[in-house]
């Protein structure tokens, strides 16, 4: 391409002037980069929906999956994404990063080269998958204590019905409980740390949106001066200052010290900072900003998603108040059967083994999540090499791909939601049934299936494959403990719903932007302490 330009008469004229020649060379280089790395590949696939239909993406996913069940189709987003048939999950879900990449897609979405968001953090993943999951029972007492502290702090005495913005209150409680496990007290309760773990996610989105305002060729020169980028740097720097005393104390401990056993849980004592540092390579162990970045990334991945799940569940509960009684009855039955402990303030705590016995609550959480997932698709990746599919299609490098999980979770042809698979009294998947998965687990052979944290071909909210969410078991416990506290000790209703009649039509509408689903941040509820709180 370059030689053709300079072999022409115009090219020879341009070449006689160094400045023009340099400019022409730059144009050639930019054109090459655009064609090679940025231009979206053209695909001969059906297109479902119209460009700009941001609010209808969810509808188009279902329509496309049912119209084209055996072939990929395109959602004309910016950039476009190819939705793959669910039947080919197994040939894609465990492909290596040099074929399809979750990490590269996340880096693309958040402009990792400018923001640092999306860098691979193997030490964090390993600490969650190996250590946090293995020692998960040891987190339960602290979670229960912190949930009670969070409710008291955020809602106060509340002897009479008092209005609250639901999402923002839940967000702070989730951040408190997450911090209790991830950094421990007293830092987890310090307002600065709490605010940073909450705002980091929102500031990441602001930074991404700020960069998007500039054409791709200009970003390298402007991003370093953006205040949104400076804010991310501040989070990491200041986070490092706050974490350094904890890091230094942890590193100073004798690595061969005798392990302490938690008398209440029977589990080996440990903390997440210890586990994280154990897997951190080389000199990075001594870098408090690296530790801070891991903590911020952890908050990015967990705090808002768990807060959304809790908020959705509460909104479903207050608009379907018929579920209060069976969920509270289950809590009382489990508490009577297993016993309980009483903390220093006289409050009852469930036994560690009781959490997994709350099957009706687990079912309600899963059904709420089925209707209100954080995203309408799963398995989002970008092709890092040409991808040949068994459908006969070849997707070129640079193609974004996903699976239509929202349709899977609402399609009566999906085995889990088919009448043949379910017990008598089957509820079609387009209708809400808070005890759907409880009833399935009552069937012989299905006792351990269909849990909130389940990840398989037909349960895709947490992903499925080599990037399945490693923290889903912790999230399930955290959400369950928060909802159990609400059910045992609080009355809650939609603001103005004095008779507590509810009604699904009164539920504040979710916010849907492209593929992302979030609860309405303006949703208001009224709360008061139950007269027989435990």
Swiss-Prot record:
One of its GO terms (biological process) is terpenoid biosynthetic process. GO terms for cellular component: membrane. Heme binds at residue 469. Pathway: Secondary metabolite biosynthesis; terpenoid biosynthesis. It is an enzyme of class 1 (oxidoreductase). The chain crosses the membrane at residues 13-33. It catalyses: ilicicolin C + NADPH + O2 + H(+) = ascochlorin + NADP(+) + 2 H2O. Its main location: membrane. It is found in: Membrane. Ascofuranone is a specific inhibitor of trypanosome alternative oxidase (TAO), and quickly kills African trypanosomes in vitro and cures infected mice. As an essential factor for trypanosome survival, TAO is a promising drug target due to the absence of alternative oxidases in the mammalian host. Its cofactor is heme. It is a single-pass membrane protein. Induction: Expression is induced on AF medium. GO terms for molecular function: heme binding; iron ion binding; monooxygenase activity; oxidoreductase activity, acting on paired donors, with incorporation or reduction of molecular oxygen. The keyword Membrane applies. Glycans are attached at residue 466. Keywords: Glycoprotein, Heme, Iron, Membrane, Metal-binding, Monooxygenase, Oxidoreductase, Transmembrane, Transmembrane helix. It comes from the Eukaryota. Pfam families: p450. SUPFAM superfamilies: Cytochrome P450. Its EC number is 1.14.14.-. InterPro entries: Cyt_P450, Cyt_P450_CS, Cyt_P450_E_grp-IV, Cyt_P450_sf. Cytochrome P450 monooxygenase; part of the asc-1 gene cluster that mediates the biosynthesis of both ascochlorin and ascofuranone, a strong inhibitor of cyanide-insensitive alternative oxidases and a promising drug candidate against African trypanosomiasis. The first step in the pathway is performed by the non-reducing polyketide synthase ascC that produces orsellinic acid by condensing acetyl-CoA with 3 malonyl-CoA units. Orsellinic acid is then prenylated by the prenyltransferase ascA to yield ilicicolinic acid B. Ilicicolinic acid B is further reduced to ilicicolin B by the reductase ascB. Belongs to the cytochrome P450 family. This is Cytochrome P450 monooxygenase ascG. It comes from Acremonium egyptiacum (Oospora egyptiaca). The gene is ascG.
